[in-house]
UniProtKB/Swiss-Prot annotation:
Its cofactor is Mn(2+). One of its GO terms (molecular function) is fructose 1,6-bisphosphate 1-phosphatase activity. Its EC number is 3.1.3.11, 3.1.3.37. Catalyzes the hydrolysis of fructose 1,6-bisphosphate (Fru 1,6-P2) and sedoheptulose 1,7-bisphosphate (Sed 1,7-P2) to fructose 6-phosphate and sedoheptulose 7-phosphate, respectively. Substrate binds at E100, G101, T102, Y131, R176, P177, R178, D198, G199, D200. Mn(2+) 1 binds at D33, E57. Belongs to the FBPase class 2 family. GO terms for biological process: fructose 1,6-bisphosphate metabolic process; gluconeogenesis; glycerol metabolic process; reductive pentose-phosphate cycle. Keywords: Calvin cycle, Carbohydrate metabolism, Hydrolase, Manganese, Metal-binding. This is D-fructose 1,6-bisphosphatase class 2/sedoheptulose 1,7-bisphosphatase. InterPro entries: FBPase_class-2/SBPase (IPR004464). GO terms for cellular component: cytosol.
Length: 345
């Protein structure tokens, strides 16, 4: 799968990032997302595969493109027999976020990117559109920190794993009212907090790389993005745990059902009998082979954002593989018309 699709998925996120970056700073978050969706879908439909969106832009009735259950790839066409040999057919599940951090793009802020994860059919958890409590940490802490422990306990363990004092640790938390007590506990324990407005996928992945000055992600965010983060951390060997949040009193946003009991019933209808289950990265991204790809839209911790020059653009992307145990940073110059010059830096 990696040798066949590795380069292709880089081009998918690159095209989405370039399209979205053209709307950077214009205050139009919906447009920035829409053009990324269109570009990502167009490029995926040029790939020799039969792909199924398991995490996308929403349910079929709510999303015109890249909706959950949509099939993409050349081998989904009506005339697919002319192009696809059944014996060589690659069937994959796909999780996408064409513009992770739409507000960041709209207001010209750092940290947005186009992301996707793929695995063989059945290899990615089809997360409901709920919230998820998340804990991400570096490979050294894998299996040692635990989402059921307090932040104070986890920070002590994390410090020991990284041979740092708690005061030297930086924890990323989304700046939301629901995290007021968590933020205070982290500070009381002695660690430092980096608050972000959006984009916790980037924060989770950054835990897997030394030198980012991000040592953990804690708190509650969207469940679909949790699966994408888990896929990346599975490839990196980092620690990731997620637990679905079904109690509206916890998030206080009105974006999930109004009743706790109703949400539990909805999860049961989706085949989730234990709503309190804690999922590991290997359970959220359980496939034999998992690939993750991201391309910076605006500058971030790991990648530069899209830079335009006359006649083209320059992108920085990341592709991580569970199969080859590699993380490749890809610097690409896109020549779209005869340029006056090529941007080298």
């Amino acid at each position: 799968m990696e040798s066949t699709l590795g380069l292709e998925i880089i081009e998918v996120v690159e095209q989405a990032a370039i399209a979205s970056a053209k709307w950077m700073g214009k205050g139009e978050k919906n447009t920035a997302d829409q053009v990324a969706v269109e570009a990502m879908r167009e490029r995926m439909n040029q790939i020799h595969m039969r792909g199924r969106i398991v995490i996308g832009e929403g349910e079929r009735d709510d999303a015109p493109m890249l909706y959950i259950g949509e099939e993409v790839g050349i081998c989904t066409r009506e005339d697919a027999k002319a192009y696809c040999n059944p014996e060589e057919l690659i069937e994959i599940d796909i999780a996408v976020d064409p513009c992770e951090g739409t507000n960041l793009v709209a207001y010209g802020q750092n940290g947005s990117m186009a992301v996707l994860a793929i695995s063989e059919k059945g290899g990615l958890f089809a997360a409901p559109d709920f919230y998820m409590k998340k804990l991400a940490a570096p490979p050294a802490a894998k299996g040692k920190v635990d989402i059921n422990k307090s932040a104070t306990e986890n920070l002590k363990i994390l410090g020991e794993c990284l041979e740092r004092t708690v005061e030297e640790l930086v924890v990323v938390v989304m700046d939301r009212p629901r995290h007021k007590e968590l933020i205070q506990e982290i500070r009381d324990a002695g660690a430092r907090v980096r608050l972000i407005s959006d984009g916790d996928v980037s924060a989770a992945i950054s835990c897997g790389f030394a030198g980012t000055n991000i040592h953990a992600l804690m708190g509650i965010g969207a469940a679909p993005e949790g699966v994408i983060s888990a896929a990346a951390m599975r490839c990196l060997g980092g620690h990731f745990q997620g637990q679905l949040i079904y109690d509206p009193e916890v998030v206080k946003t009105g974006l999930i059902g109004e009743s706790r009991e109703g949400n539990i019933a909805r999860l049961k209808e989706m085949g989730i009998d234990d709503p309190d289950r804690v999922y590991t990265d290997s359970e959220l991204a359980s496939g034999e082979t998992v690939l993750f790809a991201a391309c910076g839209i605006t500058p971030g911790t790991l990648m530069e954002g899209v830079r335009f020059f006359h006649g083209g653009a320059r992108t920085q992307s990341l592709v991580i593989s569970s199969q080859s145990k590699t993380a490749r940073f890809v610097d690409t110059i896109h020549i779209q018309e005869q340029p006056k010059y090529i941007e080298l830096k």
